[in-house]
Amino acid sequence: MAPSSHRSGVVQPLPPDAPRRAPESKTKVSGDAENEEQPLLQASEPENVHKSEIDRASSIIKRLNLLRMTRAKGLGFIVFAGLNFSFASICIKYASHRVTSHETVFWRMVIALVLNYIWARYKKRKLVVESKYRGLLLLRCVVGTVGVNLQFYAMSKMVLTDAIVIVSTSPISTFFLGAAFLKEKINQVDLLAGITSFIGVMFVTRPAFLFASDTITKQAPPLATYCAIGASLTSAVVYILLRQLSKVDCLVSIHYFFVVGTCTSIVTLLVMKVSMTILLEPIFLFALFGSGFFSFIGQIFITKGFQLEQAGIASVMRYFDVVFVVAMDVLVLGEMVSLLSLLGAGIIMAGVSMIVLRRAREQ
């Protein structure tokens, strides 16, 4: 009799001697181990994007803070350079009473060249300039040398304070030259600070068309005044060139400036038929050495300062030179400085302080 169809669904027990099938082992699909280590809730894509934006923003903030610290350091370098240049000006003024301005330029260049070469060798710097910077460096050396000669002649014939402040009018020109050639943005506050300092310069120089004649101070020769103005214009050009040479090592740039200056001063001595005079007086010898030594230190820090800061803003800090010179004019040289000169020095400091305080608030 055939089995009925409803019995086909009944499970029959296995006979005792039938082989038992081993239980299936739970094998992990590839990737399960990695999935176990992952968090239960995956971060969504917008959250990852948000994190990357935060990281990018923090990186930008760090770079901006570093840039601000670097620029603040550049301002400090320029102020310290101004202090050294004021010492050099005192030495030059004293030496000019004994020798000509051409001799003073020669000794200043030679002494500074020797000191810079020794320091460059000590720092193991190669005095080699890339070909793309040689033209700009040559122009910087020539213009700078012309400016130094004009400045030295003006300082030897004028009251030191008046000569220095006329030379220090260069920042106003530098602001506009920097905007034209370096594409530097002119900040309104910084420009206002420069104009304020320039007003202070006017109080110190007291031009005849604005001020009555001052009987206390002596009248400067017209040629000396023109030389001081020429030194101011050449300084503005040099500041722009220093910014364009920011990739050149400062010791290398200074070295060739002193080389060109030394060669030019030798040619000037020969053409002008100046007989060299060396007085063996300790104070005079110190003045000659100091004119080179302090100029060397000042050139290092002013070059580094202009490589770090915008040309227009950095040049305004050169107004601090006037404050140093006014103090040394009275204390060291004993020259008469009018109350208007002191008022002008105060106005200059006010203009410079506007820039310094802005930099401090950025930190």
Put a short name on every predicted segment.
Residues 2-13, 55, 319-363:
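C-terminal-most transmembrane helix of multi-pass membrane proteins
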Residues 2-83, 97, 113-139, 212-220, ...:
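Membrane-interface interhelical linkers
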Residues 212-274:
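Transmembrane alpha-helical segments that form core, pore/gating elements
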Residues 82-86, 90, 117, 141-149, ...:
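Hydrophobic/small/kink-forming positions within alpha-helical transmembrane segments
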Residues 107, 163-169, 248-260, 296-330:
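Helix-helix packing/entry segments at the starts of transmembrane helices
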Residues 167, 183-203, 207, 224, ...:
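Loop-to-transmembrane alpha-helix entry segments
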Residues 74-80, 131-142, 186-199, 221-226, ...:
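Cytoplasmic-side transmembrane-helix entry/capping segments in multi-pass membrane proteins
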Residues 83-112, 237-260:
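Juxtamembrane helix-loop-helix junctions in multi-pass membrane proteins
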